[in-house]
Amino acid sequence: MSASSSGGSPRFPSCGKNGVTSLTQKKVLRAPCGAPSVTVTKSHKRGMKGDTVNVRRSVRVKTKNPPRCLEITPPSSEKLVSVMRLSDLSTEDDDSGHCKMNRYDKKIDSLMNAVGCLKSEVKMQKGERQMAKRFLEERKEELEEVAHELAETEHENTVLRHNIERMKEEKDYTILQKKHLQQEKECLMSKLVEAEMDGAAAAKQVMALKDTIGKLKTEKQMTCTDINTLARQKELLLQKLSTFEETNRTLRDLLREQHCKEDSERLMEQQGALLKRLAEADSEKARLLLLLQDKDKEVEELLQEIQCEKAQAKTASELSKSMESMRGHLQAQLRSKEAENSRLCMQIKNLERSGNQHKAEVEAIMEQLKELKQKGDRDKESLKKAIRAQKERAEKSEEYAEQLHVQLADKDLYVAEALSTLESWRSRYNQVVKDKGDLELEIIVLNDRVTDLVNQQQTLEEKMREDRDSLVERLHRQTAEYSAFKLENERLKASFAPMEDKLNQAHLEVQQLKASVKNYEGMIDNYKSQVMKTRLEADEVAAQLERCDKENKILKDEMNKEIEAARRQFQSQLADLQQLPDILKITEAKLAECQDQLQGYERKNIDLTAIISDLRSRVRDWQKGSHELTRAGARIPR
């Protein structure tokens, strides 16, 4: 805050981009860091006696410890003001500032709503992660049960292998038995042929015996030859029957042995079929073990992918936290800019009031000038009529009047210089307003970037949610496939072509997931580049604040130079006016006022140093905020 003047021209400080202290009518400003408050009153006084014109401005500084606040009172309407037109000031900036503030409030509300939505989505993601963890634990339990069943089937398979080895040994032994059985079959066939021949002979003998018995029945007389033939046929029949019985007995024995051998052969064939089935079961078991290993690998890959998703969710939450911190920082900047805007509006209103007061004081001074000129003319005429003897004194007074006219011309030049300085300060004020507009545009751009980052985070979360849903669906599918594999393992039926196709599809999906992970890494790199850009912008703002600090120092030096020039000028005027006894009292009063003004300037310098220290502390706070931004950008994982 600056209220210094040189020759009646008001001086305004260049406003920094972090904060601007304003001059308001009876406004209380809290001093930073617990410093005692200071009350500043501004008054402008212009007095003239005869043909002299003097433009002065006094700044009175009073310290008040009890309220500990900075109180600024406006100048009185009876004192001198600087020349400022009301047409130069308008309330359009105030209206536009209020509109922008409303827009910023709406944007902040939308950002708060977006952050609330993000928090709710993060909670939903946490619940989904817990559900996924429970689902994975259930799947792990099922896998453990399947592993236990596989261990039992392996034990059964080992027992079957031992039995198969024994059967193979018995098979080697039965090859010789088969050869022996072949020989026995040939022998049996020959025995069967003999038995058939014996049976045919016995049948013929029985037929012959029947014929002879029939003949005997018809003849009813038996000769010795008939008796002999009957005896012979009977003996032959008995022999044939005995041989037939022997062959039949041997044939039955052979048939019994053959049936036993056939039963043993059937058992061997059944054993061979069982061996084949066991071999097929072993091959199927090996295939199922390979498939189980592949499924275990896929489950591990899915767990790794879930861990990657968790890491991505953590990075997304960290990004949301950094965005919240950035949003808070931007809100603080926005509030500081709003306060700065309100201070500038109050300062403009105070300047309008001071301009009106200055106009009134200028008119009063012009009337005093006219009255003083008329009075001087009357005094001259009275002096010419009353005191003709004092010509030398009159000549001296005329010379002094000429000097006063010269001084009046100098004062007019001084007033013109004050007007030029006022114009320069007005241009600086316009530049400050322009810089403020640039800062507001930068804030709008930063808000747009924040919204873009929020949108990108939402798209990332949607993609992650879709990938997680696809992973859960794949887990369901794989569990269903695993149950199908379990049933096929129990039934020992093989057709694994569709499973191989599904495995190929799973590999393709894994490759697609890897590609999506690469895309996520690229998006994270983009976020890092955006954080670097914001860091560079923060550095630029810090550099602008440093430039503002330098400008404040330059203004302080210029103000000190102007104070010294005013002091010298008033001292020279005092030396000139001491020669005149009539205006001695006026010059003494002016000297006292000049001394008060010098003291006010010195106190103003103290206030300016306090303001500069405040600005430096704000610059440090800004640098701390930029360092926090850099730390937040460094926290983002690569």
Curated annotation (Swiss-Prot):
It is found in: Cytoplasm, Cytoskeleton, Microtubule organizing center, Centrosome; Cell projection, Cilium; Cytoplasm, Cytoskeleton, Microtubule organizing center, Centrosome, Centriole; Cytoplasm, Cytoskeleton, Spindle pole. The keyword Transmembrane helix does not apply. This is Outer dense fiber protein 2. GO terms for biological process: cell differentiation; regulation of cilium assembly; spermatogenesis. The modification Phosphoserine is found at residues 76, 87, 90, 96, 110, 120, 242, 613. One of its GO terms (cellular component) is spindle pole. InterPro entries: Odf2-rel. PANTHER family: OUTER DENSE FIBER OF SPERM TAILS 2 (PTHR23162), OUTER DENSE FIBER PROTEIN 2 (PTHR23162:SF8). Self-associates. Associates with microtubules and forms a fibrillar structure partially linked to the microtubule network. Interacts via its C-terminus with PLK1. Interacts with ODF1. Localized at the distal/subdistal appendages of mother centrioles. Interacts with MARK4; the interaction is required for localization of ODF2 to centrioles. Interacts with TSSK4. Interacts with AKNA. Interacts with QRICH2. Interacts with CFAP58. Interacts with BBOF1. Interacts with CCDC38. Interacts with CCDC42. The modification Phosphothreonine is found at residues 73, 91, 212. Tyrosine phosphorylated. Phosphorylated on Ser-76 by TSSK4. Signal peptide: none annotated. Residues 125-198, 226-404, 442-616 form a coiled coil. Belongs to the ODF2 family. Residues 373-396 are annotated as: Disordered. The keyword Chaperone does not apply. Seems to be a major component of sperm tail outer dense fibers (ODF). ODFs are filamentous structures located on the outside of the axoneme in the midpiece and principal piece of the mammalian sperm tail and may help to maintain the passive elastic structures and elastic recoil of the sperm tail. May have a modulating influence on sperm motility. Functions as a general scaffold protein that is specifically localized at the distal/subdistal appendages of mother centrioles. Component of the centrosome matrix required for the localization of PLK1 and NIN to the centrosomes. Transmembrane segments: none annotated. There is a cross-link at residue 119 (Glycyl lysine isopeptide (Lys-Gly) (interchain with G-Cter in SUMO2)). Keywords: Cell projection, Cilium, Coiled coil, Cytoplasm, Cytoskeleton, Developmental protein, Differentiation, Flagellum, Isopeptide bond, Microtubule, Phosphoprotein, Spermatogenesis, Ubl conjugation.
